[in-house]
Amino acid sequence: MRHYEIILMINPEKNKKIFIIIEEYNKLIHMYKGIIHRFEDWGKRSLSYTIKNLKKAHYFLMNIEVSSECIKELENSFKFNINIIRYFILTRTKAHKKISPILKNKEENKKELNSSVIKINKNIKKK
C-alpha cells in the first residue's frame, strides 16, 4: 500500500450531498482495507477563476494509505461524479498526520477573533 494526498473541490451548491459523497469515498477506502491518516474539511473557498460557472468550491483534504486498485477506483469515481469540480491525487512517501497550514491558519484566526471579542466585552463591562 502507498500513501496518497487527495484534494477534492466539490460543488458548494450541493450542500446536502457533500457529506454523503465524502462518506461514499470513505466506505470505498475502507472496503479496500485502506487507512485514512488525515481528513480535513477546509470549507467553502473562493476560486481564482470560474470553473463550470462556479465562483466557490467546498474543499476537502485526505491523506490515505491504499492500494493502487483503490486509487484507480477513486479516480474513476471522481471523473464521473458531476458534483466534483476538480480533484488532485498526489503520491506521498509517508503518512501526513499534522494539521495542514490552511486549517492551522483558520484555527489561529478564530482564536484571535475570540480573544479580541473577549477583550472588547471586558472593556464594555468596565465602562
Curated annotation (Swiss-Prot):
- Name it: Small ribosomal subunit protein bS6
**What keywords are assigned to this protein?**
Ribonucleoprotein, Ribosomal protein, RNA-binding, rRNA-binding
* Family stated for the protein in its record: Belongs to the bacterial ribosomal protein bS6 family.
Q: Which Gene3D superfamilies match?
A: 3.30.70.60
Output the CDD domains linked to this UniProt entry. bS6 (cd00473)
Q: Which Pfam families match?
A: Ribosomal_S6
Q: Which GO terms describe its biological process?
A: translation
State the organism of origin: Buchnera aphidicola subsp. Cinara cedri (strain Cc)
* Single GO cellular component term: small ribosomal subunit
**PANTHER family noted in UniProt:** MITOCHONDRIAL 28S RIBOSOMAL PROTEIN S6, SMALL RIBOSOMAL SUBUNIT PROTEIN BS6M
Function in brief: Binds together with bS18 to 16S ribosomal RNA.
A molecular-function term among this protein's GO annotations: small ribosomal subunit rRNA binding
The superkingdom listed in its UniProt entry is: Bacteria
